[in-house]
Amino acid sequence: IVYWMTSARRARWNYALDHAIELANEHNVPLIVVECLALGHRWANDRIHTFVLQGMIDNRKLFESSPVTYVPYVETKKAQAGGLLQSFSKDAVAVVIDDFPTYMPRDVAQRAKNLADCSVQCVDSNGIIPLRAPERSFSTAHSFRRYIHQNVLNFVSTPPSSNPLKDLSDVGSGSHIVTQCFQDADVPTTPLEFIWRVSEASREGREALSVLDIDHEVSPVDDRRGGSLTARTELKKFIEQRLDTYHVDRNHPERGGGSGLS
């Protein structure tokens, strides 16, 4: 089973990962999670690349103690990842991919449907209520909120798993499959040293990124780190320190009452 991770870049609270684990257990086959960062999106720059690669470091820590074979991959030539996706799908039972409504992840999901030699299953991890549940569009935020208030209890009882990796059976390693797929696609793997250097958001990290065809004018933000572990820390701080007054303070920037999650 291949989980091609494009938008829900986390190892917890992720419906797509939950589904991929179910499939791997059902078929007793290795689960390979490929977290890909492509060059082809319009705003590819040093800041976004650094932020995403910091998340890859977090995910590697979370996945390494599980049977998941985790593959962080950074594209070095445009459209390179398409051949890699096709290579991974060749002998796969299924490809699971994030279902995201706009932009690059949506385009990648559509390409996957066209390229893959196996079943492609798109899974929505954008929120508690599936995007397609309303079966209609909303002309105002107010009407959407009313729908949420009326229907959220229908979905909140089945949240994604907070620790899905414990549910994965010992399905074996997919490392040999990964090596073969990269060779067949004639695509270089991404060295862990490169990801680590970039994630440090230092001069060395910017030098490492200089070889990529992206916008180097938009620099990383040194005091803001990406990744799911940082996100969980920020969420915890918001819940413990600001949630009770959020409804009052959020519209007064000088009070510092925002969520800090945007």
Locate the predicted segments by residue.
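Glycine/tryptophan-enriched, flexible segments
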Residues: 137-262
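Trp/Phe/Arg-rich N-terminal binding region typifying the photolyase-homology
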Residues: 1-172
